[in-house]
Regions:
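Loop/turn-rich, solvent-exposed surfaces of beta-rich toroidal or solenoidal domains
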Residues: 277-340
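C-terminal tail/sorting-segment detector
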Residues: 66, 447-467
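Terminal processing/anchoring signals of secreted or surface-associated proteins
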Residues: 391-398, 423, 428, 448-450, ...
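Short glycine/acidic-enriched loop and turn motifs that connect beta-strands
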Residues: 79-83, 134-141, 199-205, 260-262, ...
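Repeated scaffold domains used in trafficking and secretory/extracellular systems
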Residues: 60-65, 106-121, 165-187, 230-249, ...
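Residue-level detector of functionally pivotal "anchor" positions at catalytic/ligand-binding pockets or at interdomain
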Residues: 387-411, 415, 419
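Beta-strand-rich domains and repeat architectures in extracellular enzymes and scaffolds
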Residues: 47-83
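Blade-level signature of beta-propeller repeat domains, shared across WD40, Kelch, NHL, RCC1
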Residues: 347-392
Length: 467
């Protein structure tokens, strides 16, 4: 954990805004010791809305899936009148358009599919796809069908093409409910895969992922591959539970995250490759919120997971961002950088379980790239953050013996008056500060990062344990 804590070292001059804002995350996320920094662009959350539910763009309707492409966020929406995509500016959260979707894309003849416009995804070529929810794919009638439609939102009315329309054999013993999906490749014009995680609390359903191969823009709906997941975290879990999410990394690997389970990396045979079982101290606070994504930025590799549930006491419905040590992307060697939003999105309870991080890599300063991170949690809000990894921190890392201090109870005393003494918890939140003093008091027992700005301007950082 010491390596993790050193990565959380922060500059003593950074501060946290004392005034709550209605459109911004009030927290300031200090640079890490390795040059990352997270900056909020906007935040529309239940916490900033007095605890009340938040609707994307203020548009009524049921909105579950979210995707981002070309600087725009798209959120699924359905109501009694039909379905639409809510288009938002990914940097400001402003409502741009309410894009009505053709009713015919959810029908077979005069018969309609169930639970239309439930999830939205973007393929590697930037095409947008929307699906329904199938409460049971077993059978041959229209209500059993799971359908994925490409939609061209640049046209009015929206043009669409069905790329997958599939059912499963009625002889399967368990209910095969599909809430979500993911895709990889050029699904519209080229080759790729579409994968459906099955919801459920029983083995035979909730430990299953259905995979379809796409060739030249045509999905082989008649020949799906059934992937049985061999293990879960926690080990006692036998199935994912409600509304699992997957994130396809490439043709060989994917993440799976369920209501009953932690995010886990699998191969296409269902064998476990890696996961938080190999780094238990960094395990998310709880299961129950489903969302995970991995990305590369300027040669470094990162992971974002939905880390807290709506009942968390400190930061309900928040996300964790981790840094892998290298391109091997080992969980055992990764470090926690930030938990965000620092106060969470909100505690509005729901059965949907959607808590999605989406990342778009865009041009930054000086030839570097930066990441535009958008988050969305059903009824609890959404926000945008900018993430860079080329910040000059000016932090001097030292070993513990180079910074003399004593601990008496919860009070830490350093050797000589300092310009500023700051104390941070393990997720980078400032918990105490002293200016022009020699002592600082920890709020409780635990592990902290002590940051001291000396009178000569040097900054020293060390891990401190209060027991």
């Amino acid at each position: 954990m010491s390596k993790t804590l050193l990565h959380l070292a922060v500059c003593a001059l950074c501060s946290v805004s004392a005034v709550a804002q209605t459109t911004k995350d009030a927290a300031i996320y200090a640079p890490t010791a390795t040059g990352e920094q997270l900056t909020n662009l906007y935040l529309n959350s239940a916490i900033l809305n007095g605890g009340s539910a938040v609707l994307p763009g203020g548009v009524a309707g049921d909105a579950r899936g979210m995707a981002v492409v070309n600087g725009k966020m798209y959120v699924c929406n359905r109501d009694a009148e039909g379905s639409k995509l809510i288009e938002l500016d990914a940097r400001t959260g402003s409502l741009l358009r309410k894009i009505e979707l053709p009713a015919d894309m959810w029908k077979e003849g005069e018969k309609a599919l169930g639970f239309i416009c439930n999830d939205v995804q973007v393929d590697n070529a930037g095409h947008i796809f929307v699906s329904n929810m199938a409460t049971d794919m077993r059978g041959t009638v229209v209500t059993n069908a799971f359908r994925v439609n490409y939609v061209d939102v640049t046209k009015t009315p929206v043009a669409y093409k069905t790329v997958l329309n599939a059912t499963l054999p009625a002889t399967l013993p368990k209910t095969m409910r599909i809430d979500t999906y993911d895709l990889y490749g050029d699904i519209l014009n080229g080759d790729g895969i579409i994968m459906l995680p099955v919801s459920g609390n029983e083995a035979g359903a909730g430990n299953t992922v259905i995979k379809y191969t796409v060739t030249s823009g045509v999905a082989d709906a008649a020949n799906p591959q059934t992937i049985v997941l061999t293990k879960f975290n926690p080990e006692k879990a036998v199935a994912s539970g409600a509304a699992p999410r997957i994130n396809i990394i490439d043709n060989d690997l994917f993440y799976h995250d369920g209501f009953n389970t932690m995010p886990m990396l699998y191969d296409m045979n269902g064998a476990v490759v890696d996961g938080f079982q190999n780094n238990k101290p960094l395990t998310p606070a709880s299961t129950g919120q489903n969302g995970v994504t991995e990305f590369e930025l300027n040669g470094s590799y990162y992971l974002i997971v939905a880390s807290t549930n709506t009942d968390d006491k400190e930061a309900p419905q928040a996300f964790d961002i981790f840094k892998f040590k290298d391109e091997g992307r080992s969980f055992a060697a990764m470090t926690l950088l930030y938990r965000f939003p620092q106060a969470g999105l909100g505690g509005v309870g729901n059965a949907v379980r959607t808590a999605l991080p989406r990342v778009e890599i865009i041009d930054g300063e000086g030839g570097h790239k930066k990441a535009l991170i958008n988050i969305y949690a059903y009824r609890n809000g959404y926000g945008g953050y900018e993430f860079v990894n080329n910040v000059s921190t000016g932090i001097t890392k030292v070993e513990g013996e180079q910074l003399d201090y004593t601990v008496s109870g919860n009070v830490i005393t350093v050797n000589g008056a300092a310009k500023a003494i700051s104390l941070y918890n393990v997720i980078g939140q400032k918990v105490a500060e002293t200016v022009n003093g020699q002592t600082v008091k920890a709020p409780a027992r635990g592990v902290y990062v002590l940051n001291v700005q000396c009178k000569n301007g040097n900054t020293k950082t060390v891990k401190v344990v209060i027991d």
